[in-house]
C-alpha cells in the first residue's frame, strides 16, 4: 500500500518518502500523462505502468509483506497479486535511490497542464 511504498522510498533515499515524490513531475502522484521530465519522473512512469499490469487486487490499498535485509528490500512470498505490487514498489524505490541526482525541486508541484505527448507503457 502507499504507506509501505513510502517506507521503502525513505529507506532507499533517506527522504520523507512519498512526501518528496507525491506531486513531482508528470507522473509522480495520482494519475499521470505526458513525457517524464527526468529520470526521477521516469521512475514514477514505470511504477504507474507496473501497477497497471497488476491483476486481482488494488495496488494502492493492498497490504503485502516485505522486509529490509542488509539494505535490500525483500518482498514476501505471498499470493501473486500482493507480490507483484510489492515488486512494483520495490523497483520504484530503488529507482528513486539510484536517480536522486536528477531530483529537481522545480518539478515539485509541477503544472499538469505542461505534461503533453504521453509515452506508452
From Swiss-Prot:
Subcellular location: Secreted
GO terms of biological process kind: arachidonate secretion; lipid catabolic process; phospholipid metabolic process
Top EC class, one word: hydrolase
Keyword flag Secreted: yes
Tissue expression from the record: Expressed by the venom gland.
Pfam name, any one: Phospholip_A2_1
Chain positions recorded as Ca(2+) binding sites: 27, 29, 31, 48
Positions in coiled-coil regions: none
Cofactor remark from the record: Binds 1 Ca(2+) ion.
Swiss-Prot/TrEMBL keywords: Calcium, Disulfide bond, Hydrolase, Lipid degradation, Lipid metabolism, Metal-binding, Secreted
Cystine bridges: 26-115, 28-44, 43-95, 49-121, 50-88, 57-81, 75-86
Stated family: Belongs to the phospholipase A2 family. Group II subfamily. D49 sub-subfamily.
Function description: PLA2 catalyzes the calcium-dependent hydrolysis of the 2-acyl groups in 3-sn-phosphoglycerides.
Protein name: Acidic phospholipase A2 PLA-2
Organism: Eristicophis macmahoni
